[in-house]
Amino acid sequence: HIGVMPKSETTKLLVEQAVSQLSAPVALRELSDIYHCNRALLITDPKLYLAGVAAPVVDQLRHQGIRVAEYFTIGETVSYEDLRGALPKLNEFQPDVILGVGGENALSAAKALLALYVDSELDLTAAADDSHLIPACDKAKLVLIAADCTSGAQTSPFAVLKDDEGEIRVLKSIYLLPELSITDADFTQWLTAEGIK
């Protein structure tokens, strides 16, 4: 009699193996070598954080002498409330680079926080209607690392947000384009067939 591992356990094992083999993208070296960054705020979602997907990025940054603060309290669609929760850490830590690691929600959060870093009182609903209200940020670089294969958010000027009434709002501005966009196949190995659908 040969035991068969349940599908859920097999999937969990495959995800754990993929995550354990992750290494940080080589392009991250530019943050210290070229941009001379000292403080990074890393934005990801709880699922990726708990799976350890962002850990190689954090390790690489710290190895380069860059201090790292992490924020991962965001929902499936990043909300205004999520962003308000991140503002104290953003303003206290004063990063010179904001990194988003994940899918559209984490990358949208990173983009929106870049705009709020310049103007913490920015009316996001008004900015969604008028892109001219979105300020350019000279306080921090934006780096986006895709950890899914569906949205293309790592190369787009859009941030998809949910307002306080549950309505979807989309920020759009060239100022939300990243300084560095990283698409690394290693960072999608953790995805399951169900996760891609």
At which residue positions do the language-model features occur?
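N-terminal loops that bind phosphate or other acidic moieties
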Residues: K12, R62-H63, E92, L113, ...
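Conserved beta-strand elements of the Class I
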Residues: L41-L42, V97-L99, V143
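Conserved acidic residues
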Residues: N38, D96-I98, E179
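A glycine/threonine-rich phosphate-anchoring loop and its flanking beta-alpha core
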Residues: E16, V118-K197
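Short, solvent-exposed amphipathic alpha-helical segments in soluble enzyme
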Residues: I34, P56-Q60, A115, F158-L161, ...
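An N-terminal, well-structured beta->alpha segment
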Residues: H1-E70
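N-terminal small/polar loop signature for handling phosphorylated ligands or for N-terminal nucleophile
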Residues: Y49-L122
